[in-house]
Amino acid sequence: MIFRRVARGVFPMFGDGKTTYHPLYIDNLVDAFIAAMQLDVGNGEAYLIADENYVEIEKLVKAVAAALGVDVSIPHYPLFPLVAAGHVCETLCKPFGVTPPIFPRRVDWYRQNRAFDIRKAKRDLGYRPLVGLTEGLARTASWYRSEGYLPLPDIASASVR
């Protein structure tokens, strides 16, 4: 979980951090579903639903840190050893029915670009993502804290910032 790792203050970045990620805040997804249902369009059609813009993963990590109100160190490491470790772990764990701690799909977060074109949803459904990245991350951080997934902010240190 990105938020938990960032909250610890260090987020290891494998590769250059320029891989793109296209976030989607849940309210935006729900809005798209409601629009499709109310307009009764798109039967049998596929739509890509995402927030307005994609973001490089290092910038996403920094935005999560801002939403949490914490400083984060982002040391960079070469990607290849992680890719190799993912394949080795998966190969060794699979025969024993053990979920590997690292596997190729998890490593892909650092290396596969995910940037989508939402124009079709905008055109056909009138889709407009209303909650932007900064607000969505702030709401997510608040929810994680209220549900106990993240510690509450330290009031004393927060006031010093």
Language model features: what each stretch is:
Residues 35, 39-102, 118, 138-139, ...:
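Mid/C-terminal beta-alpha module of Rossmann-like enzyme folds, strongest
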Residues 17-30, 46, 54-58, 115, ...:
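Conserved loop-to-helix N-cap of the C-terminal "lid" that shapes the substrate pocket in Rossmann-like
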Residues 120-122, 128, 132-161:
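Amphipathic terminal alpha-helices
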Residues 7-8, 38, 69, 145-146:
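Residues at helix-coil transition
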Residues 10-15, 20-26, 90-114:
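Low-complexity, charge- and small-residue-enriched intrinsically disordered regions
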Residues 1-4, 91-94, 148:
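Short, hinge-like loop/turn segments at secondary-structure boundaries
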Residues 1-31, 35, 64:
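NAD(P)-dependent short-chain dehydrogenase/reductase
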